Structures are given as C-alpha cells and as structure tokens.
From Swiss-Prot:
Residues 281-303 are annotated as: Disordered. CDD domains: Sulfate_adenylyltransferase_2. GO terms for biological process: hydrogen sulfide biosynthetic process; sulfate assimilation. It comes from Chromohalobacter salexigens (strain ATCC BAA-138 / DSM 3043 / CIP 106854 / NCIMB 13768 / 1H11). This is Sulfate adenylyltransferase subunit 2 2. The keyword Disulfide bond does not apply. Heterodimer composed of CysD, the smaller subunit, and CysN. Its EC number is 2.7.7.4. Belongs to the PAPS reductase family. CysD subfamily. Keywords: ATP-binding, Nucleotide-binding, Nucleotidyltransferase, Transferase. With CysN forms the ATP sulfurylase (ATPS) that catalyzes the adenylation of sulfate producing adenosine 5'-phosphosulfate (APS) and diphosphate, the first enzymatic step in sulfur assimilation pathway. APS synthesis involves the formation of a high-energy phosphoric-sulfuric acid anhydride bond driven by GTP hydrolysis by CysN coupled to ATP hydrolysis by CysD. The lineage of its organism: Bacteria, Pseudomonadati, Pseudomonadota, Gammaproteobacteria, Oceanospirillales. Pfam families: PAPS_reduct. One of its GO terms (molecular function) is sulfate adenylyltransferase (ATP) activity.
C-alpha cells in the first residue's frame, strides 16, 4: 500500500523524532511525556520506546485527566501503560472536580482552562518537570504551525509567540532557568497522513474509537456528540440515534464531534483521509469557543 518513497519519508520523520526524544533525555534533568491517549500520543510513545529499546524510556508518562474522557480511552490508557512498563502519572484538578466544573454548566472555555490548562500547570509544578513532550503537529492548527520544536515556557508556563528562540536545522536550545520549562514536540513536522501511514506501517495500537462502528449520537451545534455515559444531559425531545461514526480526533467526549463513516480498517481510514477537505480538529469544540481560541489557550499554558 505504501510506496518505497513514502516509506523512506516516514523513516526520515521517525529518525528526526527519535533524535529529538534522545536529545531531551540527555539534556534535561526531569522530563515527562504527556500522554493524551490519542493517535499522536500513540505514535510518540512508540517512537520513545524505539529510541531506548531494549530499555524502557527514562521518563514517566503523564495523563491530565479531566474526568470527561471516553471510557474506551481510559481502558486503552491503562492497558498500554501496563504493556510498556513506564510509570503513569494521572493528575486531576481536585479543586475543579470538587467545584463540579463541567462543560455543560460552565462552558467549554472555562472548563478547558480549569480542568486542562490549570491542571497541567499544577502537575508540572508538583513534580518539577523541566521538559514535557507533547504530540502536537504544525499542520493541525494555525497557532501550532508557528511554534518551535523546543517551545520555551516561562515560570508561569506561558508561551509568547512573539518571543520564540531561533531554531536552526536540528540545533535546539534547551537552556532554562529554575522554574522555566520547555514543551517539546517531536511530531512537529508530521502531517495527519504521515501519522496514519506510520500507524499502518508499524502496526501501532490505537483507541478503537478511531475506527467506524455503530454508536449512539446526538447532533448539537453541527457536531455528532456520542452519548458515552449517563452524565450527558439530553435536551427536550432529544433522542440518541445509532449511526456509523468514527473520530478523527479524541478529547473530552461532550466536546468532541464524530464524523459519519464506514471506515473500519486502517487502509479505509487512510483512503477517507485523502479525500476529506476538512481539518481533523474541526470536530473539537474547544478550538472554536472564541476567536483565536487555541493561541489564547497556549499563551496561558495549554498543551
């Protein structure tokens, strides 16, 4: 299915990412790999295991749990953590949970800030991590397109897009003062197509939600929202409908739209992806809750 040229291209991307991961492990005192359980995280974890094979990567995984992830994501996370033998740190913003912060009563912007951004900052401070791997790619979204591979964050974990460090070729500046940190994006130069073809080439396990199947959904604001548990409040006259859907991107289930699809295998997903004309993150409500939404979130310390 993949031409020799495509396989060579993927191997070049693989080599670049492995170099970045090893560079961080050698350069920083206390790195961590942020594990959001999506396809990009799965590829990044696979690359980290390759980078240090036959040993175990010398840093832990960390999942910032909002408590609203799909059930299948949490099951997959626990299974993978046990398989790879890495420490898994789970962090929940307990103040937010105690206050009952949720995407329905408080809106996606406040919910994301409290349960994702503030939670991540709490965890980074608590464990004193000076570098955090993330699975973001430049082709995903405009603000991510201009972010460096080594993305400097100040002592408040804020990102200033107007004051980024020069990054020439594969020379990365990891110097930080106490309290400062670097967000590292080994998949920066990968595209969505690269990710899917690499998953196919390497037989990387992913959450089953990426594959099409009959699932109960309701339509809200133009998005197909899956009814994953009893916490989703149904509106008057709203009845979940069983449809063949899958997810191109995974987040908190009330804020993540499915796409109607019958693509139930990797070759079918890749073929469908080649024909689509919409961004994979068009199904993420948090990207559209206000103008310049993602850049604003990243300035405040978001992933």
């Amino acid at each position: 299915m993949l031409s020799p040229e495509r396989q060579t291209h993927l191997k070049q991307l693989e080599a670049e990412s492995i170099h970045i991961i090893r560079e961080v492990a050698a350069e920083f005192a206390n790195p961590v790999m942020l594990y959001s359980i999506g396809k990009d995280s799965s590829v990044m974890l696979h690359l980290a295991r390759k980078a240090f094979y036959p040993g175990t990567p010398p840093f832990p995984l960390m999942h910032v749990n909002t408590t609203w992830k799909f059930k299948e994501m949490i099951e997959f996370r626990d299974r993978m953590a046990a398989e790879v033998g890495m420490e898994l740190i789970e962090h929940i913003n307990e103040e937010g949970r105690a206050a009952g912060i949720n995407p329905f009563d408080h809106g996606s912007a406040k919910y994301t800030d409290v349960m994702k951004t503030q939670s991540l900052k709490q965890a980074l401070d608590k464990y004193g991590f000076d570098a955090a791997f993330g699975g973001a790619r430049r082709d995903e979204e405009a603000s991510r397109a201009k972010e460096r591979v080594y993305s400097f964050r100040d002592k408040h974990h804020r990102w200033d897009p107007k004051s980024q460090r020069p990054e020439l070729w594969n020379i990365y500046n990891g110097k930080v003062q106490k309290g400062e940190s670097i967000r590292v994006f080994p998949l920066s130069n990968w595209t969505e197509l690269d990710i899917w073809q690499y998953i196919y080439l390497e037989s990387i396990p992913i959450v089953p939600l990426y594959y099409a199947a009959p699932r109960p959904v309701v339509e809200r604001d133009g998005m197909q929202i899956m009814v994953d548990d009893e916490r989703l409040p149904l509106e008057d006259g709203e009845v979940p409908e069983e449809k063949w859907v899958r997810f191109r991107t995974l987040g908190c289930y009330p804020l993540t739209g499915a796409v109607e699809s019958t693509a139930a295998t990797l070759p079918e997903i890749i073929q469908e992806m080649l024909l689509t004309r919409t961004s994979e993150r068009s199904g993420r409500a948090i990207d559209h809750d206000q103008a310049g939404s993602m850049e604003r979130k990243k300035r405040e310390g978001y992933f």
